[in-house]
Curated annotation (Swiss-Prot):
GO biological process terms, semicolon-separated: meiotic cell cycle; sporulation resulting in formation of a cellular spore
Protein name (Swiss-Prot/TrEMBL): Meiotically up-regulated gene 28 protein
Keyword list, A-Z: Cytoplasm, Meiosis, Repeat, RNA-binding, Sporulation
Native source species: Schizosaccharomyces pombe (strain 972 / ATCC 24843) (Fission yeast)
Top-rank lineage group of the source organism: Eukaryota
Physiological role: Has a role in sporulation.
Amino acid sequence: MIALEKLSEKNKRSTKKCEISIYVGNLPSTCQSSDLHELFEPFGNFSKFHMLSRKKNKSTDSKSPTLFAFITFENKCSADNAIASLNGSSFQGNTLKVEYTHIVERYKNKLENGVDQIHHSNNEKAKIRFSKIEKYTKETRPTVSEVRVSTKDKKEYSMNTSNLVQSNPPKVHDKENAFAEATGTSILSSKAVQTLLVSDFTENEPKHLSIRPNCKDNNTPSISNTFIEPYKENNTEHLHLKSAFEPCQMMPGMLLEQNPQFLYDNPSIFVIGILNLPLKVSPVELYNEFSNHGHILGVAINQSINEDMTHYAEVAVSTYESCIEIIEKFHAIAYEGSILQLFIKQPVQGFCSNLLNHPEGTMTNLLPPNMEMPQPFEIPVIAKTSALPNPFISFPSFQTSYETTVTPTPTSTPTIDPCNLFVKNLDDNIVGNTQQLEELFSKFGRIKSCTLASYPSTEISKGYGFVSFSHPFEAVQAINTLNGVLFGKKRLFVNYAEKREDRKKRLSAIFSQSYPPVVPSPSLTIPMATEPQILEYHQEWPQPLIQSIQQHGYSDPRQTLPTRLDSCAAKLREAVISNENLNPSHKFGIKHSTFKTSLSPLTNIVLNQ
């Protein structure tokens, strides 16, 4: 056989498993590839096109060869339409023969007769050829292991609450179609399985929707490699998706576009985590219960059972008000015999990539977080610190009653917008206008408004401003990242913004309690006692010297002076009297020869005693 012409550049495509090959015989000798291309083009796209020639029997006088062709369509529907329309039709004077490609009978007989010889022979090429022919000639209906999910389908699927409706049928293999027709089901594509919710068929319970998340872990097979196999229940075959982990149930009203990337890109969506959820609660019941208190976008329940025989669930709401209302309504409340614990889920760094690769969920991370989001309106407890005590004095116990903790009452706490931030200590050399301030905070999320305070006349920055985010999580991340950071020559202060009146009220509530008067510490006087005595603290001021001597029994220090000083004192008085008789110019230590000589005998008398 000689190949006349290969596929044109327009229709040249790679071979696919879902391609269907048909045989076109009895073509006229004058037929060109372009004519055959125009004949089969209305029935659909075909990836391969081969026109071949075969010489007739030697007994025939005609020397014109017989032409035939093989055409490979992309789907079975196009091949069926081409066979039904062109088989037996007239084309340039010849009656066409259009049918599915099959192996010639003589090759089948050779195969059947030589099976045993091939199995027992040592010819590796024969075994390989036999395996290829055997694979080609097996039955049309595949086995369970052959029905795979198509990985190259790009069609989208729509979902109804009670059943699944396939809006655009995918292009699948003929064997898969045959299996779908035999079982009354449809083959889903990889994208459909990853995003579409497959219903769980149960008799006693309502139809819940369960999603099998896509796992990209190296140790766990992904959804694209997962088999779809039929399982029989009450003589009815359904598609069952085998998975390496437990599924998570989701409410029927969940939209298909609400994936982790969609949740992250739309900051108006809040996710509430629910702990201690009873096992008997379904997503539909939880959705109906919470929908009375706000607009619910979706509900997801993790089917892995905790140690306390409860489930973990998440609820997606559209507004911050609905989120707070649901938490105030159901937090720490008994629900179906269990105390629910609700919290606002806080995203972590690498939110999108971590959630898309997480093996336990696709809507959000279905594991309870380690820490809760701090409330923006909490006021830290300020404790009064006492000074270090004097090691020589044991203070009385009544002073410890003054050391109290100032805790503001909840009624005096003003409400603070969790999205609005106040920034001060901005360096003018780095942030000089509103645009630069917005660029500084834009990496944390979408900014609704941004203002930098400046002087009207000179437009010089005052060093503080306000930034309003669209989501509280973004504001929390900005505070945790920039507060206290050395920015230029100054250290930034980033916190929640509040009105000046509210700030005064909050500060007055903290410092409203008057502190007791400070008791002055007494001056310590260590007496000259012969025996050590225990000193006790007293509030009286030090007594005069005479009372102190009488109280403690001390003697007058003058009584202990030696008797030999009496004569010295008499000599001193005589010297003073003799000094008064001197001239006025010689008094009071005026340097004079007579004054010097008059003091010399006195000095000698004192030293000689």
